[in-house]
């Protein structure tokens, strides 16, 4: 990627599309989003009709996703809260954070298998909320 090409983004735990909205306002193209809740998906379909909805993060394979320059995500945090049982990243909900890491690893391995140089592996940037 050079600075003269379009920067692209994928969004995990997309919700109502906060990351894609910020991306568009900054000249970045949202390519795909992962979300499981029906209402938020409908919102993002209206806001971003060209964005692909890829479904449940636990069922995704990073090598099969369209390559993007940036991945954003805000995984559930209930198990990290001091108000809860404090299960941490081994908790059922907050443990989904590790799915984000798996997706990035699988995407980068696929890029490497296609012959891309290590310094150019995508996604190049991650933004976790």
Task: Tell what function each PLM region has.
Residues 1-129:
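Conserved active-site and SAM-binding loop architecture
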């Amino acid at each position: 990627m050079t600075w003269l090409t379009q920067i692209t983004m994928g969004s995990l735990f997309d919700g109502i599309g906060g990351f894609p909205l910020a991306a568009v306002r900054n000249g970045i193209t949202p390519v795909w989003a992962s979300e499981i809740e029906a209402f938020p998906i409908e919102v993002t379909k209206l806001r971003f009709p060209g964005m692909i909805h890829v479904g449940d993060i636990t069922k995704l394979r990073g090598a099969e996703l369209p390559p993007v320059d940036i991945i954003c995500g805000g995984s559930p945090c209930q198990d990290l809260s001091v108000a809860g049982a404090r299960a941490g990243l081994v908790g059922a909900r907050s443990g989904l954070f590790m799915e984000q890491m798996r997706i990035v690893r699988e995407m980068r391995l696929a890029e490497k298998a296609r012959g891309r140089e290590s310094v150019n592996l995508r996604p190049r940037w991650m933004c976790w909320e």
